[in-house]
């Protein structure tokens, strides 16, 4: 997976899967400061209800 792609998909679909969130938390120690700012922004969008958390794999597009 790639953080940029996850962020783009979440913004376009308005949904992020638990699998993607797990990947972010497992790999955050490798992220740059810019990457971390994107993760913080993603968290704010989730907190504000703009991006929903979805357990279904159908939100994950290959």
Q: What annotation goes with each model-predicted range?
A:
Residues 1-33, 56, 60-62:
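N-terminal acidic leader/helix
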Residues 36-62:
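Short, charged early-sequence alpha-helical segments and their helix-coil boundaries
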